[in-house]
């Protein structure tokens, strides 16, 4: 039986999960992320009627990393037709690491989905073609959805990622060789790394993503962010591809559409009810927040929520 939400439930879940801290590893392949305090743990929930619940380090900002891939897809959906987007990127889970080159080579430069690095780079390449200032536009979108006007990029993280971008550059050039990348590689990479370097808190992420629980409508903006069908499609992609190669395990344990980032954040959606954001910087072997997944697992068990 489903139970009512309150902050005490969230605080109790964090207490249960905190012993897991120390078992994962903070992302160290991006030097600017390697210095993050691995003991941080937070959760925030925003409901479709605007209620906010939080516990732990829910108001501390962190690098959202690949969570931004959902936002770049949303922006692309507002500027490109369905046919234009999906002829350049697929909708299937990859089953491979998020920065794999092998699968991309075998599949003629068409990424499996927009939530692996190759797919997100294609989406950023598309945005470069239709937006005069892609980085500024993303800030406008995030600030509008969250209702917070000072959200910004962590330029130190963006620079650190660009200085260690050989693999992502290789992905972009490989797609360019197949004709699926149209703009200057360096320019698009810079935009991509800035998107990943957005600094947001769990509270801000939950408010930003509640439109996916609310049929495409943000709770404080009159104009829909996406159509109800697009919201459903994005949730479906998150369910199949948002946790990289661990999507099946996550579906088994948590049962919600979600998107993770190597900054330790995860955003999960309960359709028609709420958006959930968790943060714990220590990652498992697949690059997902180890304690964050455990928090979501306990939450869905206690609340009786699942899309399955």
Curated annotation (Swiss-Prot):
One of its GO terms (molecular function) is glutaminase activity. Gene3D superfamilies: DD-peptidase/beta-lactamase superfamily. GO terms for biological process: glutamate biosynthetic process; glutamine catabolic process. Its EC number is 3.5.1.2. Keywords: Hydrolase. Homotetramer. NCBIfam families: Gln_ase, PRK00971.1-1, PRK00971.1-2. This is Glutaminase. The gene is glsA.
């Amino acid at each position: 039986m489903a139970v009512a939400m309150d902050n005490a439930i969230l605080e109790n879940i964090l207490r249960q999960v905190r012993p897991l801290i120390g078992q994962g590893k903070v992302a160290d392949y991006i030097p600017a992320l390697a210095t993050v305090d691995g003991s941080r743990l937070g959760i925030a929930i925003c409901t479709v009627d605007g209620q906010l619940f939080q516990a732990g380090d829910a108001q501390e900002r962190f690098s959202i990393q690949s969570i931004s891939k959902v936002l770049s897809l949303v922006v692309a959906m507002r500027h490109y037709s369905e046919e234009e987007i999906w002829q350049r990127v697929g909708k299937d889970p990859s089953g491979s690491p998020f920065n794999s080159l092998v699968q991309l080579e075998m599949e003629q430069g068409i990424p499996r989905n927009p939530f692996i690095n190759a797919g997100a780079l294609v989406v950023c390449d598309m945005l470069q073609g239709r937006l005069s200032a892609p980085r500024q536009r993303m800030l406008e979108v995030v600030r509008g959805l969250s209702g917070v006007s000072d959200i910004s990029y962590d330029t130190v993280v963006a620079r650190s990622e660009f200085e260690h971008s050989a693999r992502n550059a290789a992905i972009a050039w490989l797609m360019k060789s197949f004709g699926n990348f149209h703009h200057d590689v360096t320019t698009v990479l810079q935009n991509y790394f800035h998107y990943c370097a957005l600094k947001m808190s769990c509270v801000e992420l939950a408010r930003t993503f509640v439109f996916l629980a609310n049929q495409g409508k943000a709770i404080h903006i009159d104009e829909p962010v996406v159509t109800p069908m697009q919201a459903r499609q994005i949730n479906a992609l998150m369910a199949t591809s948002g946790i990289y190669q661990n999507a099946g395990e996550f579906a088994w344990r948590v049962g919600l559409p979600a998107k993770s980032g190597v900054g330790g954040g995860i955003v999960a959606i309960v359709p028609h009810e709420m958006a959930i954001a968790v943060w714990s910087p220590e990652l498992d072997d697949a690059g997902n927040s180890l304690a964050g997944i455990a928090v979501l697992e306990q939450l869905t068990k206690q609340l009786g929520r699942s899309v399955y």
